[in-house]
Amino acid sequence: MKKRYRIKKSSEIDAVFKVRKFKGDSYFAIYQSDDLDADHFRFALSIGKKYGNAVSRNLAKRRIRMIVSEHSGIFIKSKLFVIVVKPLAQSLSYQEIKDKLIVLFKKSKIMENANE
């Protein structure tokens, strides 16, 4: 996943949180906002220290980045979103993470094609 698809500045992440438009479950929450000037979507990951040690947090971030990059062709171009990973997600396998995130992407209408 190229770095231009990531939200890096904390002010941009705070702006997404201020919109308060989100969907979530007991494992993840997705906050989103619109960026009409963008030619592609951008995202950020937030994972707290309660999730586990640095190794497990980095593994979760790598997995989620991979899931987003696999489905990057079907995200709406003008969206900014932040994926918040909750501590319960530590017990999930890669396939379970993928399934739950895709359901949340569809619920939050970030994907262009809901049939994917």
Ranges and model annotations:
Residues 1-116:
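Positively charged, solvent-exposed patches that mediate nucleic-acid binding
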